[in-house]
């Protein structure tokens, strides 16, 4: 029977010593195989022994933490004592450090819990509309790679190839770094470079904050050209530059060179250019002349026509810069909140309502319209982050108590869709009393619709992630929403139901183990034959039509509990 003769380490060493010039296949491989150490499992005599109960010597305070509570301290973690060759000393030290931190420092547990809670929410900082990045100098120690990139781009401005110069000028405008050597290189190429490079260099200088008379004159010359695309790029760059310029306080602003010549050119473009170019020109003029009646009238006309994104640009100028809070502006903000397809624009609309304030809304007679639309957005908005922003706006406008009363009363609506809407709204408005919390638990037991049960479950999880009282109440609860088998056995209440044998049937076993997508979608339920509600509500909201009652008996004890809740609220 053929077999492979095992390699002996002494034979290989002897042959290498006697004949070092010889080479043969797999020589290094065989040597490595022969030199590899053999790891054997620990014998029964080498395995660590456990003593029950542990000796008193193990119970002592940690040397570095004399004020901590004593615990049973071992030299090595138990989980790492089975094999010596699986973990090196560095990993063992890290494991010991982690175990000590978990035992001693209660703040570690708190940090882990807070990190887990953040999984439920999309941080508002991710949606806050940031002002356009201002140009700034860069220190070499801050970002060495970006500093090296700046050096390479400034050298490319001196390249004999025109396309390299053009690309370098565009890239420097995107980086928004206004160091002296960058500005000097751009000014030099703007005077001596080809025509296309000069055009891009002047545009980049304006974006970087250089608005002297030479740059403004070059931009005016470009705005008078017949090339529509080039004119649009110039207007966009000028608008970005003036936006950064207006963000600085008035006492620290630099004077815009040849402003008197730039204003008439912008006024002419507003009257004679295309809609998009006219809007950009109006925005540029709005930064220079915030009280211009011409700009205000043009932007108000833009609110009734054009794309939603263009309307949002006009709204930003009217609300934030020109401080126009008239009825058409408020209606346009509500329209953006209700029907805009851009997530950031809907979020920014909620911030605009805060800026306008309840007094201006009441003065324009739009309080009822605003209340009805905000109430609708607390449940039909697909993204949780925007629903949370709507709830914050409701609280800022002091409309939350009235809305909470209506939403809590809607929990007992016989229609399943109405109940689900109320449950989703409570997920962002919050649970303000123990009676409402227990009512939601009773609804979870009595509800037959799986969609409503799922919404109830998500609402309880969201409220538990921000309310310590609810979190403590649900600590040992199992929220199980799964398809019940079709049997004649009556199902037990959810709060006392045992866990199913198959854990895969559970949607969420424990709210502490749940990992909801921060932008989970609340699917709107529409019935067959039911008309779709318009995106923007009319001035006077119509009363809700009577919907058919849900099939199946309703729990009278929940109605009684709601009546008690209403009496307490009064």
UniProtKB/Swiss-Prot annotation:
Protein name stated in the entry: Protein HEATR9
InterPro entries the record matches: ARM-like, ARM-type_fold, HEATR9
Organism: Macaca fascicularis
């Amino acid at each position: 029977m053929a077999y492979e003769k095992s390699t002996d380490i002494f034979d290989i060493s002897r042959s290498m010593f006697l004949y070092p010039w010889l080479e043969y296949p797999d020589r290094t491989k065989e040597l490595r195989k022969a030199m590899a150490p053999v790891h054997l499992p620990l014998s029964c005599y080498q395995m660590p022994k456990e003593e029950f109960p542990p000796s008193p010597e193990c119970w002592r305070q940690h040397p570095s933490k004399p004020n901590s509570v004593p615990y049973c301290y071992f030299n090595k973690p138990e989980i790492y004592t089975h094999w010596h060759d699986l973990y090196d000393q560095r990993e063992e030290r890290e494991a010991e450090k982690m175990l000590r931190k978990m035992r001693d420092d209660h703040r570690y547990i708190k940090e882990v819990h807070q990190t887990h809670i953040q999984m439920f929410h999309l941080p508002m900082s991710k949606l806050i509309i940031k002002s356009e990045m201002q140009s700034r100098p860069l220190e070499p120690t801050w970002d060495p790679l970006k500093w090296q990139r700046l050096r390479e781009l400034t050298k490319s401005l001196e390249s004999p190839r025109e396309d390299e110069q053009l690309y370098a000028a565009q890239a420097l405008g995107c980086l928004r770094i206004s160091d002296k050597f960058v500005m000097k290189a751009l000014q030099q190429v703007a005077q001596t470079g080809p025509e296309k490079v000069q055009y891009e260099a002047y545009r980049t200088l304006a974006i970087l904050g250089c608005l002297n008379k030479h740059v403004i004159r070059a931009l005016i010359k470009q705005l008078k050209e017949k090339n529509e695309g080039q004119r649009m790029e110039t207007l966009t760059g000028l608008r970005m530059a003036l936006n950064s310029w207006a963000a600085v306080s008035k006492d620290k602003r630099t004077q815009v060179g040849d402003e008197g010549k730039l204003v008439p050119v912008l006024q002419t473009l507003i009257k004679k250019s295309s809609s998009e170019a006219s809007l950009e020109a109006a925005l540029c003029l709005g930064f220079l002349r915030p009280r211009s009646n011409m700009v205000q009238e043009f932007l108000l006309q833009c609110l009734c026509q054009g794309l939603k994104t263009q309307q949002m640009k006009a709204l930003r100028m009217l609300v934030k810069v020109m401080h126009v809070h008239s009825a058409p502006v408020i209606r346009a903000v509500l329209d953006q909140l209700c029907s805009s397809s851009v997530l950031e624009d809907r979020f920014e609309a909620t911030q605009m309502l805060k800026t306008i304030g309840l007094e201006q809304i009441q003065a324009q007679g739009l309080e009822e319209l605003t209340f009805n639309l905000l109430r609708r957005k607390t449940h039909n908005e697909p993204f949780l982050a925007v629903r949370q922003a709507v709830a914050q706006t409701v609280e800022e406008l002091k409309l939350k108590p009235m809305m909470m009363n209506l939403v809590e009363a809607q929990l007992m609506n016989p229609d399943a869709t109405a109940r689900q809407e109320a449950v989703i709204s409570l997920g962002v408005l919050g649970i303000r009393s123990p009676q409402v919390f227990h009512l939601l638990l009773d609804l979870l037991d009595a509800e037959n619709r799986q969609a409503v049960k799922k919404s109830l479950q998500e609402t309880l999880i969201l409220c538990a992630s921000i309310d310590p009282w609810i979190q403590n109440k649900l600590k040992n609860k199992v929220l199980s929403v799964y398809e019940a088998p079709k049997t004649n056995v009556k199902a037990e209440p959810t709060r006392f139901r045992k866990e199913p044998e198959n854990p895969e049937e559970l949607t969420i076993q424990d709210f502490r183990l749940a990992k909801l997508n921060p932008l989970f979608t609340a699917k709107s339920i529409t019935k067959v034959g039911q008309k779709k509600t318009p995106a923007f509500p009319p001035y006077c909201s119509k009363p809700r039509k009577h919907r058919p009652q849900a099939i199946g008996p309703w729990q009278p004890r929940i109605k009684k509990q709601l009546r008690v809740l209403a009496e307490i609220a009064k």
